[in-house]
């Protein structure tokens, strides 16, 4: 796995302004929050966030299998609120198995529908997180860190309770939230291309 730290002004300009801005602190009591918000992200934090995402997906599947849809939906909502940046604004989310006109899910409701289904506004969603996932593996092709923003790209391999395997190409981008934790602000997932 390759990790890159970018210092180039050209690439930094492509990332959120918050990643390169230095906050002006007007009052001493604001300093701890601002310092946390703008603290540089580390590779260990990115890898921990990826593991937390995989563990959450398995937990939602297990919750569905053991306690039913309502419990899985509640847990999925908690995961979205904790791991994704929907509370900060739109998230650029392109799930693996979506079709036009609902390919992109910039709202929390759209993401929740993708993960657990059951939303009439998203009739093609059957609940990706409800597919019996029991194990996962993340293999990064690379991680790019610029200040308080990070991007990773690689593969996520998932196994269900029967041992069936699904591999997806995955790109995530994070920024640090006001609580100091990483928040997913971009999530792109697709099935690997297979030349015929």
Q: Where does each model-flagged region fall?
A:
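Bacterial N-terminal signal peptides that target proteins for export
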Residues: 2-11
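A solvent-exposed, acidic/Ser-Thr-rich amphipathic alpha-helical stretch
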Residues: 67-140
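Short, low-complexity N-terminal intrinsically disordered segments enriched in polar/charged residues
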Residues: 26-83, 90
């Amino acid at each position: 796995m390759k990790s890159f730290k970018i210092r180039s002004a050209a690439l930094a300009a492509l990332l959120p302004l918050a990643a390169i801005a230095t906050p002006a602190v007007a009052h001493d009591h604001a300093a701890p929050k601002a310092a946390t918000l703008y603290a540089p992200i580390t590779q260990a934090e990115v890898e921990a966030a990826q593991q937390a995402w995989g563990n959450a997906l398995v937990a939602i599947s297990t919750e569905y299998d053991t306690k039913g849809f309502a419990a899985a939906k509640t847990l999925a909502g908690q995961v979205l609120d904790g791991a994704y940046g929907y509370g900060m604004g739109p998230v650029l989310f392109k799930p693996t198995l979506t079709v036009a006109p609902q390919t992109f899910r910039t709202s929390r409701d759209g993401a929740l529908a993708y993960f657990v289904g059951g939303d009439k506004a998203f009739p093609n969603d059957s609940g990706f997180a409800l597919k019996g996932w029991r194990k996962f593996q993340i293999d990064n092709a690379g991680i790019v860190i610029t200040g308080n923003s990070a991007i990773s790209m690689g593969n996520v391999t998932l196994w269900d309770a029967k041992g069936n395997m699904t591999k997806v190409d995955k790109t995530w981008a994070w920024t640090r939230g006001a609580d100091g934790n990483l928040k997913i602000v971009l999530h792109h997932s697709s099935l690997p291309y297979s030349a015929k």
